[in-house]
From Swiss-Prot:
The gene is frr. This is Ribosome-recycling factor. The keyword Protein biosynthesis applies. It holds the Pfam family RRF. Belongs to the RRF family. NCBIfam families: frr. GO terms for biological process: translational termination. Keywords: Cytoplasm, Protein biosynthesis. GO terms for cellular component: cytoplasm. Its main location: cytoplasm. It comes from Mycoplasma pneumoniae (strain ATCC 29342 / M129 / Subtype 1). GO terms for molecular function: ribosomal large subunit binding. CDD domains: RRF (cd00520). It is found in: Cytoplasm. SUPFAM superfamilies: Ribosome recycling factor, RRF.
């Protein structure tokens, strides 16, 4: 059995976790407006629930404003407006002719600290899931009952090396997010 089987299992699973982490961290509000905040909003339109990004162009208007311009203003502007209000994002949308403007107030120190706490919680969840993936990989190695104990130890060491790389990457991502949140 080649070491790649185990390392690929570990890496593929960990990469999926990191993709989820990046998506979750992008949803945490920072001092700057982020269009990704609206990626998961589903708007009632044309008799179905559709992603907002399929119904409107979302653009940042520096320094603290997002402008949402529906492709079909007549049919969708009110539905988009209502969904933003319902989503409880801590912002107040304003309909301005054929577009919706959303001003992001500056974050207070309290809201920054709350966002940092939220980011740490998400990172810790991934940290726990990485431990679980590592454990599952090590159990796969053990279950496959290698005749050569040295080879089994080699595999375990390789998994640990890769795990340490992911942990370091996780810490870097957390520090970057905290730095981003602390910028005034």
């Amino acid at each position: 059995m080649s070491p790649e089987k185990y390392l690929n299992f570990f890496k593929e699973t960990a990469d999926k976790k990191f993709q989820w982490l990046k998506e979750e961290l992008s949803k945490i509000r920072t001092g700057r407006p982020n269009p990704k905040l609206f990626d998961n909003l589903l708007v009632e339109s044309y008799g179905d629930r559709m992603p907002m990004v399929a119904l409107a162009q979302i653009a940042v208007n520096p320094p603290r404003e997002i402008v949402i311009k529906p492709f079909d203003v007549k049919n969708n502007i009110n539905a988009i407006y209502s969904e933003i209000q319902r989503a409880n994002l801590g912002v107040q949308p304003v309909i301005d002719g054929d577009k919706i403007r959303i001003n992001f107030p500056p974050m207070t120190q309290e809201s920054r600290l709350e966002s940092i706490k939220q980011a740490k919680k998400v990172v810790e969840q991934i940290h726990q899931e990485l431990r679980s993936v590592r454990r599952d990989t090590l159990q796969m190695i053990k279950k496959d009952d290698h005749k050569d104990e040295d080879f089994e130890e080699f595999l375990k060491e390789e998994v640990e090396k890769v795990n340490k790389q992911y942990i370091a990457q996780l810490e870097t991502i957390q520090k970057q997010k905290e730095k981003e949140l602390l910028v005034v």
